[in-house]
Amino acid sequence: MCGGAIISDFIPPPRSLRVTNEFIWPDLKNKVKASKKRSNKRSDFFDLDDDFEADFQGFKDDSAFDCEDDDDVFVNVKPFVFTATTKPVASAFVSTGIYLVGSAYAKKTVESAEQAEKSSKRKRKNQYRGIRQRPWGKWAAEIRDPRKGSREWLGTFDTAEEAARAYDAAARRIRGTKAKVNFPEEKNPSVVSQKRPSAKTNNLQKSVAKPNKSVTLVQQPTHLSQQYCNNSFDNSFGDMSFMEEKPQMYNNQFGLTNSFDAGGNNGYQYFSSDQGSNSFDCSEFGWSDHGPKTPEISSMLVNNNEASFVEETNAAKKLKPNSDESDDLMAYLDNALWDTPLEVEAMLGADAGAVTQEEENPVELWSLDEINFMLEGDF
C-alpha cells in the first residue's frame, strides 16, 4: 500500500447516487408487457448510470416491443383527416347505420350529417321580414326607403303578425308588385304603389296659381269710359282710373245703349253697377249729413219709335234745413219727379232721340259744381 493505492478487487467502484425504477420495482418490464402499457422511456434516456450493462439493458428493453403493441397504441389516437369529397361506400355505411371501426372518414361523415340535420331544423330568429322584438315583448316594424336612403319607422305592435302586415303594406307602397312581403297571398287593394313624381308633374303643380279671394281693382274699360263718362254725373269720378270689380249688369235694365237704331240689331252692352247706384244724393260723396236726399228712381227706356219713360218712385224724404236754398231745391225736385214724362224730358234738356244721338245720359240732373254751390253755407 504505497502512495495510497487502492486495490481494485477489494474496493468496488462507486455507483450512481440516483435511484432508478429497477432497484425499486425489479419486475416492472414484465408487468408492462402483461398489461400492454408502455413504460416511461424518458427516465431511461436520462439515466446517468455509469454501468455499461445497465445502459445496454435499457436499449434492449426498448427494442422488445412487438408490432401488436404499436397497433394498440395508435388506435386510440384521433386522426386529423381533411377530405373534400365523400366516397359512396362510406355514405352507404352511414345511411345504414354501420360505421367502420377505426376509420377517421366515418367519424367525419357522421359529424357532417349531424350538422346538416341541425341546419335543416334551424329557424330564423324572426319568422317575419322587417320586424324585431323589443325586450319587453312588443314587436317593432321598420323598412328601408331607397328613395330617402334611410329607415322608415312603422310603429310598435302587440303581435308579430300585425307588425309583419304593416311591413307588407309599406313594402307594397314603396316597391309596388316587386316587393318581398311576409304574406304574398294577401293583396290589399287599398294600398296603391306610389311612384316617385316626375319633375314635369312638379312644375305643373307649381305653375297653377291659387285663386285670389281678396277684392281686386280692375281698370275701367275704354268703350265704357268713352260712352258714359261725358255727362256731369260721371265727370265727378273722372280722375279715378280704377274701380272695384262688381257683377256685370246689362244696360237694357237701365235703358242706356250705344247709338242703336229702331230695329235693335246691335247687341246689349253692359257696365259695372252696384246697389244704390241710382240714388242721386250726396251719400257717396262723403257729406250725406248736409246734402239733400232724393228718392230712388228705376228707369227703363223702351227701344221703339216713341220714347216712353217708366218711373217707380218712393215717398219724398224730409230735408234738413241746413241751407238757405233748401226750399228752392225741394220745389225743383218735386217738379222734376211728379210732372209728366214730357216735363222730365224738358228738364233733362233733350228728348229720347237726342239722347241716343248725342250719347248722353238721360238721367242727368245736376253737376257737382251745383252741389258745391248749394252747400257752401254749411262748409
From Swiss-Prot:
One MF term in the entry's GO annotations: DNA-binding transcription factor activity
Pfam families: AP2 (PF00847)
A Gene Ontology cellular-component term: nucleus
Major localization listed first in the record, in broad terms: nucleus
Coiled coil: none
Residue ranges: DNA binding: 127-184
Induction cue: Up-regulated by darkness, ethylene and Botrytis cinerea.
Inactivation phenotype: Lethal when homozygous.
Family (UniProt): Belongs to the AP2/ERF transcription factor family. ERF subfamily.
Oligomer and partners: Interacts with MED25 and SINAT2.
Protein name from the UniProt record: Ethylene-responsive transcription factor RAP2-2
